[in-house]
Each structure stands twice: as C-alpha cells, then as structure tokens.
C-alpha cells in the first residue's frame, strides 16, 4: 500500500470551534481519512507505549505557536514520511493499534454511523452475493460473511481475498487494490460514489499447486472454475483454438476438475491482468499490457506488423523495486504549500538481472503501479513461505463469542455459460529474446516533477543466475 498526505485543509471545529489543520491521508492515491495532528500524535504515543521508543520512527514535534504556511507544509511532509515508515515496518504496520486507528478515522471522515447494512460482493463470473454486515466491519469480517453465505469452509477462507475493482463496459474488472485490514469495505466502496466500483471475491495465491487444497471442496472447486472461465472469456488466459475446443468439451461434460487441470497448463493461468499502460521496454514509451502471476511480470506488446510479443520478468531475478509518485509542478516550477495537486503519475521500476553481470532498471508507468508492486511482494512472500516449508493457510481472527456467523440460507456458486469462440488475435504470441540485449540502461525520474518515492523494496527471493540460465 502506498500512503501519502498530498494535501492539507483548514477546517472549523465543531459548533463553531477554533480552526485547525486537517491532514488528508491517501491510500493508493485515494482519500482514506482526514485527521488532525493531535490524533496522529495520540497514535504515535500508543505505538511507543506498546513497542518502545527504539522501534517507532521519529514524530514531528509539537509547536507552541500557530504554524505558518511553510511550517504546515513541512509538517505535512514529515507526517507523510512517518505514516509510510510505520506502514512499511512489519511489526507496526500489521499491528491492531495502527489498523484500528485507520479504520476509525475512515469511518469518522466519511461520517458513516455504525449500523447493519446489505453489501453486494461479486464473484469472478459476475454472480452477486448479498451479505449482511455492519458498516464498521473490517475486511476479514466481510470475507468471513461471504464465505459463510457460500458455505466455504473456514480452513479455505485464507485462500481467497476481497478486491476493490472498477467494472468496465465489457464486464471485465480493472483492479484498484486488494482490500486491507486497515479499511472498512462498505465505507471504501460507497465513499467512491460510483456504481462502477465493486467488491470482488477472488483467489489470493499465485502457485497453482495450492489449487489442490481448494478443489477438494465443492464450493472451492466452483469458485476456481467460475474464475477460470471468466479469465478465459476476457482473454486473460491465452488459449489456442485447439485448447479452446478441449476446454469447451470438458465444460459441456461438466468435468470441472479436468477443465481446471487443462487450464493450469495454459499461459497466464491464475494471472492478474492490468489495464494498458506504458513501459520503457523494449523501447521508450512502449504501449504494453502487464500481467502478474506464476512468479513473474509479463509485458505484452504489439509490434508494427501487428504481431504480439511478450517479455517475462521473473521475480527471482528482480534485485529490488520501487514505486514513485510524482505531480507536475505549476508553470514556473515553484511549489506553494497550499497548492492544488494535479493528477498523480505513478511508476513501478524494478532492477532486473538481464545476464550474469548486468542489472538494468525497467520502468512501467501506470495508475495501477502500486497494485503491481503489491503483487510482486505477495509473490515473493509466497515463494519464501514455500521455501521455508510453511503453509499459506492462515489462522483466522475469531470474533468475540467464538464461531463465524453462518447464514441460514447458503448461496450456491452458479455454473458459468459455455465458452465462446476464441479471438484469433490472441493466438500469435512470440517470446522476446531471452537475452533482452536491445534494452539499454536508463534512469527514472524527471527534474520537472515534484516526486515522492516510497522506499525501495528489497527482494529476499532474488537469486543470482549465470548466462546458461537465461
């Protein structure tokens, strides 16, 4: 998650109280909550009390007198760095103290009272699941409610996640982010005030070997099957005409497990596909479509002859990556503390081991750069868990009072319609040269922008390779 405080507001206190400065905390470029300095100071003091002064980052000091505009801007920058540092710390960023603070602040900012509501969650095939939740229910609460409605066993809930998406005209989903433990799904989706935004249930792991655990259960099997059919229909999974014929035959026989076994062998099975964007690979300002999955980022591009090509970047060959956000400065290049902020430009840049002795930066410019970074991190995390012999089955936080709420009337996962004929343009896919020798090293960033870069993400799954491995 990318935390930022891009702006401040001067607001009046309740009942005509004295004015104060509010700091707008954004997550992935969208307003999450609006807080006062005193609220963040209270959070800081609570974290220090629980974890010690040596663990918690430094906090901007109090001031005896009212702040000048320049001092407000300085404090904004310091608070932004503080929030980023806390979130990136594995201990502090996952703490209930930090996450509950953000949930309360989100609810207060949007002025949503705590009450029981109906929330619509979509499956990958567009099927609607209506669950009854509280407006103050956090992400895991809602996930458990959806699982209960579908009768998905408790031990399989950890294989799925809720995603905030924007539904496009063709019915496909543009992924905004995976809903996190610090937010309230009902508030997150309704605060966007657009019917385009939905919450979708989708599997949350990358390694198809984990499919075996999910497929043992009828509901889990149906969820994987519905997601796979949807991904094929939208062109996320690449199929030839012959493969499509085989899949349709298995679908007609309602052979769901065999259907999934065949789908697992197809290119881009289980990948997340992002909207079209721009990369500097294999040349500057190259239009590409990025997909994430199977421990790699895939870049598809169309050459002048309309031939599709693909370049694959394995996460084990990425030494590190970073997300950079920048905002064009007003004409004249000067920055005002209270200036309005333009549209944020996001870049994902990763340092890639092209050959044994050659590391090179590759940059992708996309509004979904943060989501791509999250995908990279989760793939690395999954690789490390598997390498250590661990399991992705997670222990679920239990509600006060014990067991999950189970609905009296479970909802079945509907079987999707038969596959339509494939798009012939999806068949011609040529791998780029594995040496990638045509790409030259270039830096990132621009002197004409006001940039705020998040910390570089080191990759613990990075492996050195030799030329014979390329």
Swiss-Prot record:
Q: Where is this region: Disordered?
A: 401-426
Record-listed a 1,2-diacyl-sn-glycero-3-phospho-(1D-myo-inositol-3-phosphate) binding positions? 36, 38, 62, 75
Query: Where does it reside?
Result: Cytoplasm; Early endosome; Cytoplasmic vesicle membrane
Q: Which residues form a coiled coil?
A: none
Annotated PX domain ranges read: 1-109
CDD domains in UniProt: FERM-like_C_SNX17, FERM_F1_SNX17, PX_SNX17_31
Q: How does it sit in the membrane?
A: Peripheral membrane protein
Q: Which InterPro entries match?
A: PH-like_dom_sf (IPR011993), PX_dom (IPR001683), PX_dom_sf (IPR036871), RA_dom (IPR000159), SNX17-31_FERM_F1 (IPR048763), SNX17-31_FERM_F2 (IPR048767), SNX17/31_FERM (IPR040842), SNX17_FERM-like_dom (IPR037836)
State what this protein does. Critical regulator of endosomal recycling of numerous surface proteins, including integrins, signaling receptor and channels. Binds to NPxY sequences in the cytoplasmic tails of target cargos. Associates with retriever and CCC complexes to prevent lysosomal degradation and promote cell surface recycling of numerous cargos such as integrins ITGB1, ITGB5 and their associated alpha subunits. Also required for maintenance of normal cell surface levels of APP and LRP1. Interacts with membranes containing phosphatidylinositol 3-phosphate (PtdIns(3P)).
- What's noted about domains in the record? The PX domain mediates specific binding to phosphatidylinositol 3-phosphate (PtdIns(P3)). Required for association with endosomes. The PTB-like F3 module within the FERM-like domain mediates cargo recognition via their NPxY sequences, while the F1 module (Ras-associating) is responsible for interaction with membrane-bound HRAS.
What's the protein name?
A: Sorting nexin-17
Q: Which organism is it from?
A: Mus musculus
Taxonomic path: Eukaryota, Metazoa, Chordata, Craniata, Vertebrata
Q: Which gene encodes it?
A: Snx17
């Amino acid at each position: 998650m990318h935390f930022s405080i891009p702006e401040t507001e001067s607001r009046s206190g309740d009942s005509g109280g004295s004015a104060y400065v509010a700091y707008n905390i954004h997550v992935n470029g969208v307003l999450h909550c609006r807080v006062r300095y005193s609220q963040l100071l209270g959070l800081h003091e609570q974290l220090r009390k629980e974890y010690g002064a040596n663990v918690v980052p430094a906090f901007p000091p109090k001031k005896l007198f009212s702040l000048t505009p320049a001092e407000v801007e300085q404090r904004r920058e310091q608070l932004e760095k503080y929030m980023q540092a806390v979130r990136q710390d594995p201990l502090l960023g996952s703490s209930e103290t930090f996450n509950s603070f953000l949930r309360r602040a989100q609810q207060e900012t949007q002025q949503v009272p705590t009450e029981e509501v109906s929330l619509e969650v979509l499956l990958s095939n567009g099927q609607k699941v209506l669950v009854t939740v509280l407006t103050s229910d956090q992400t895991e609460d809602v996930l458990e409610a959806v699982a209960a409605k579908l009768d998905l066993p408790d031990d399989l809930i950890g294989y799925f996640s809720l995603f905030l998406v924007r539904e496009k005209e063709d019915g496909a989903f543009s992924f905004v982010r995976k809903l996190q433990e610090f937010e309230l799904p009902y508030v997150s989706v309704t605060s966007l005030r657009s019917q385009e935004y939905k919450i979708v249930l989708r599997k949350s792991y990358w390694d198809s070997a984990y499919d075996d655990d999910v497929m043992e259960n009828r509901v889990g099997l149906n969820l994987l099957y519905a997601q796979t059919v949807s991904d094929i229909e939208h062109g996320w999974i690449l199929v030839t005409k012959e493969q499509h014929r085989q899949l349709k035959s298995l679908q007609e026989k309602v052979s769901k497990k065999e259907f999934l076994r065949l789908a697992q062998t197809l290119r881009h099975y289980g990948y997340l596909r992002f909207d079209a964007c721009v990369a500097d690979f294999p040349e500057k300002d190259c239009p590409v479509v990025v997909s994430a999955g199977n421990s790699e980022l895939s870049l598809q591009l169309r050459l002048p002859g309309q031939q599709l090509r693909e370049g694959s970047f394995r996460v084990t060959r990425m030494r590190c990556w970073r997300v950079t956000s920048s905002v064009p400065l007003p004409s004249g290049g000067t920055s005002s503390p209270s200036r309005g902020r333009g549209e944020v430009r996001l870049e994902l840049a990763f340092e890639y081991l092209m050959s044994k002795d050659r590391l090179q930066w590759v940059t992708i410019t996309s509004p979904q750069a943060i989501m791509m970074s999250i995908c990279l991190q989760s793939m690395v995390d999954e690789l490390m868990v598997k390498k250590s012999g661990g399991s992705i089955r997670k222990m679920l936080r239990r509600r006060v009072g014990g067991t999950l709420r189970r609905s009296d009337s479970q909802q079945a996962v509907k079987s999707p319609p038969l596959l339509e004929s494939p798009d012939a343009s999806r068949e011609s896919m040529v791998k780029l040269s594995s040496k990638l020798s045509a790409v030259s090293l270039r830096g990132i960033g621009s002197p004409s922008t006001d940039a705020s870069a998040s910390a570089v993400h080191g990759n613990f799954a990075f492996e050195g390779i030799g030329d014979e491995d390329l």
